[in-house]
Structure formats: structure tokens, C-alpha cells
Design a protein with these regions (language model features):
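A short glycine-rich, Lys/Arg-flanked "PGG" loop and its adjoining helix->strand segment in the class I
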Residues: 145-160
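A short acidic, Gly/Pro-enriched loop at the edge of an enzyme's catalytic core
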Residues: 120-131
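Class I SAM-dependent methyltransferase SAM/SAH-binding core
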Residues: 62-121
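C-terminal alpha-helical "lid/dimerization" subdomain adjacent to the S-adenosyl-L-methionine
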Residues: 164-223, 229
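Conserved alpha-helix/loop element of class I SAM-dependent methyltransferases that forms part
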Residues: 31-34, 41-61, 76
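N-terminal auxiliary segments of SAM/dcSAM-dependent transferases
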Residues: 1-23
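Hydrophobic beta-strand segment of the Class I
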Residues: 32, 132-133
Length: 255
């Protein structure tokens, strides 16, 4: 199986993955929220709600949401967890612009700030945030382990990292239906709704290739996180990964 880091939205295009991902999300931004609801029958909202509930066991004053997209997770965290601030970063200006409008509509401008940012080079000092999250974005990283190291760097000792990522069901009963849906139905809907024909073919390819379960937990451990856990949801079609930064970790842990 090809490494997910080598799977790009536009295949043989010579540009690096980050550039292709930015172009893809700029193109599909107007249809992105609708497609998320349609593809998951609205279950993506339940997955985010579950993730935020897992964070609620401790108070987090400052939260970073990486690959924030149109801000769904950032907005839910701001409205539920009562943080002082939620910062969301994303490569796509078009996605961020839609997210800013949603933040304004939710009257959360004083709590949520969205801006352009690269997960591999986060513009924040060491040990800045109490929690770092990323929903459905890890598949798009050009280097997953480097992205996790950056998350670890900007997280305060004792802080939490939480990842939501799409995954492949392990059940031999569920998997054939899932494969048909992701490889045939979703790309067809994408071609009808979105300007970008390739984007929704890239989706099942990247899901199939992204590290899952124990393999993803191993990457979190390699980046320095403690006790990573994988929590499968909805027959294993989505997985939440959660881990901690060691409380004794020195503040200056630059890589």
C-alpha cells in the first residue's frame, strides 16, 4: 500500500502535497460543509460532539485547532468548553473565509480566531496551548510524524492532543459496503456538487492509506506523546485518537 504522505489530490502533478491540498480545499470550499453532511448523513456532527465531550474532562484555557477548515470543531469547542481562546489554522484561505463568517454568525469572534497556518511550521512558541486538535486533517499532512512533533512542541506539559480521522472498518461484513460507498457513491456525489472532480476520489484513497489504530498511536508515541488511545466510532468508519504531553516535559522542547 502506498504511504498516505505520497498520495496527493492531483496525482502526477509535480507540486508538493501542501500546495495541492491548498488548491483542492480552495476549490471545494463552497460545497465543503454540505458534502460533509451528505457523505456522513450528518454523523460527522456526532463525531465532533463525542470528541469535545472527551476534552471536557479537564479545563483548557487555550486551544489550537489544526486543519480547522470552515471552523466546525473550533466553534463547537468554543461554545461547549468555555475556553479563553480557540485558534484555528488552515492552509486554505477560502475555507478560512467561510469559517470566519460562521464564527461571526455564532457571535464567537472574541473567543475564536481563524488564520492561515501550516501544520509543519506552526507560528507559535513552545508550550502555548492546553489542547491541540485536528479533525479530518492528518490524511492531508505531507509528513504526519513532523506534524505530530509540531503539535507536541506547542502543547503545554500535561496538555491533550486529540485527532479525529476517517478510517476503514475492520469488519468483513461492513467493509464491502463501505468500500462501495466511499469509492463509488462519494466520488459521484462529489462530481455533481463540487467544482473539483478529483477531490472526492482522493478522499477514499487517502483514507485507505492513512495509518490507523495501533499504527497511528505509534506515530503519536514517536512524536513524544504519552499513552495514546484509539477510539473507533460508527463501525470503525471514524476514529478518535487522544494522548497527553508528559507533565514533566520541559517547556523548551524544540525539535
Amino acid at each position: 500500500m502506498q504511504d498516505v504522505e505520497n498520495i496527493t489530490p492531483y496525482g502526477t502533478d509535480s507540486r508538493d502535497k501542501a500546495e495541492q491540498v491548498r488548491e483542492m480545499f480552495d476549490a471545494i470550499a463552497p460545497a465543503y460543509d454540505f458534502m460533509n453532511r451528505a457523505m456522513t448523513f450528518g454523523i460527522d456532527r456526532l463525531w465532533r460532539r463525542k470528541a469535545v465531550k472527551m476534552l471536557a474532562s479537564a479545563h483548557h484555557d487555550e486551544i489550537l485547532d489544526i486543519a480547522t477548515g470552515t471552523g466546525d470543531l473550533a466553534i463547537r469547542m468554543a461554545g461547549t468548553l468555555d475556553p479563553l481562546s480557540v485558534v484555528g489554522v488552515d492552509l486554505s484561505e477560502e475555507m478560512i473565509e467561510i469559517g470566519r463568517r460562521k464564527v461571526s454568525d455564532a457571535k464567537l469572534n472574541e473567543v475564536v480566531t481563524l488564520g492561515i497556518g501550516d501544520c509543519l511550521l506552526l507560528p507559535f512558541p513552545d508550550s502555548t496551548f492546553d489542547a491541540v486538535t485536528c479533525a479530518y486533517g492528518v490524511r492531508n499532512f505531507a509528513d504526519i510524524e513532523a506534524g505530530y512533533r509540531e503539535m507536541h512542541r506547542v502543547l503545554r506539559p500535561g496538555g491533550t492532543v486529540l485527532i479525529i480521522e476517517l478510517s476503514t472498518p475492520q469488519s468483513s461484513v461492513v467493509r464491502p459496503f463501505y468500500n462501495f460507498y466511499t469509492r463509488t457513491v462519494i466520488p459521484t456525489i462529489g462530481r455533481i456538487v463540487s467544482k473539483d472532480v478529483r477531490a472526492y476520489s482522493y478522499l477514499p484513497e487517502s483514507i485507505a492509506a492513512v495509518p490507523q489504530g495501533d499504527a497511528m498511536c505509534a506515530l503519536l508515541s514517536a512524536a513524544g506523546f504519552d499513552a495514546p488511545r484509539a477510539i473507533p466510532l460508527t463501525f470503525g468508519t471514524c476514529t478518535i485518537y487522544i494522548a497527553k504531553k508528559n507533565i514533566s516535559q520541559r517547556k523548551t522542547d524544540s525539535y
